[in-house]
């Protein structure tokens, strides 16, 4: 069955006729199961809970979609780099993720309206004096590889910026907490979660990326 190629962050349809999308939806209903990709390690949107099941905001949205369609839900945990390939190879029908839209991605997928008040930004100690990408020279910047933050910062960071790419959100968070990087580039909800979990961590939004 062809993938319905949907992003829920920011329901998107694969580039093509609406009649094709309707046929793909019919396939999902006939199969009685919808395969939805969600973040494998990106709290609060998706992560493995203490009960051994995936939980989070995106997981809840996936459950609502399956219930609304009246089909069984098959959750497929993915990393940031796996999201588009899993759609393109029909491993999943939909992807629900905090993924920013850009012209390159829009060539193969359509984005829904954003479902959460989410933005990407640079976060660091309140005492670190930076306010734009131009101020990153000489600093170590941690982010998750293959994300929109990676694409945007690779273009805008000045010479002398050390961009350190990690395999998943958990590793990126850990690097910032341990002092391995000076600046954390991620979503505002991730930064808010870090502050909540670490009351002594005095971090601030330095600038917005997307």
Predicted regions and their residues:
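Periplasmic-binding protein-like
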Residues: 116-124, 188, 192-210
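Alpha-to-beta junction loops
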Residues: 34-35, 69-72, 89-97, 139-140, ...
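Extracytoplasmic small-molecule ligand-binding "clamshell" domains
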Residues: 23-98
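Flexible hinge/capping segments at coil-to-helix
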Residues: 124-141
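Short beta-strand-centered segments that line the small-molecule binding cleft or hinge
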Residues: 83-98, 106-118, 187
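Ligand-binding cleft/hinge of the Venus flytrap
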Residues: 47-50, 62-71, 112, 133, ...
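Short helix-initiation/N-cap motifs at beta->coil->alpha
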Residues: 59, 74-85, 164-178, 189
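A structural signal for short loop-to-beta-strand junctions that line the ligand-binding cleft
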Residues: 25, 57-58, 106-116, 202-206
């Amino acid at each position: 069955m062809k993938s319905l190629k949907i992003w829920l962050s920011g329901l998107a349809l694969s580039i093509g006729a609406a009649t094709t999308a309707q046929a793909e939806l019919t396939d999902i209903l006939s199969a009685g199961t919808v395969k939805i990709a969600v973040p494998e390690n990106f709290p609060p949107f998706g992560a493995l809970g203490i009960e051994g099941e995936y939980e989070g905001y995106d997981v809840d949205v996936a459950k609502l979609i399956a219930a609304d369609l009246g089909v069984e839900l098959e959750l497929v945990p993915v990393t940031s780099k796996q999201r588009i390939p899993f759609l393109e190879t029909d491993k999943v029908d939909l992807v629900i993720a905090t993924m920013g839209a850009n012209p390159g991605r829009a060539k193969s997928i359509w984005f829904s309206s954003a479902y959460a008040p989410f933005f990407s930004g640079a976060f660091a100690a309140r005492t670190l004096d930076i306010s734009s990408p131009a101020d990153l020279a000489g600093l170590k910047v941690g982010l998750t590889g293959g994300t929109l933050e990676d694409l945007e910062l690779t273009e805008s960071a000045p010479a002398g910026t050390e961009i350190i790419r990690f395999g998943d959100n958990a590793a990126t968070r850990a690097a910032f907490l341990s002092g391995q990087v000076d600046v954390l580039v991620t979503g505002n909800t991730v930064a808010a979660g870090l502050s909540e979990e670490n009351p002594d961590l005095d971090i601030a939004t330095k600038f917005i990326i997307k």
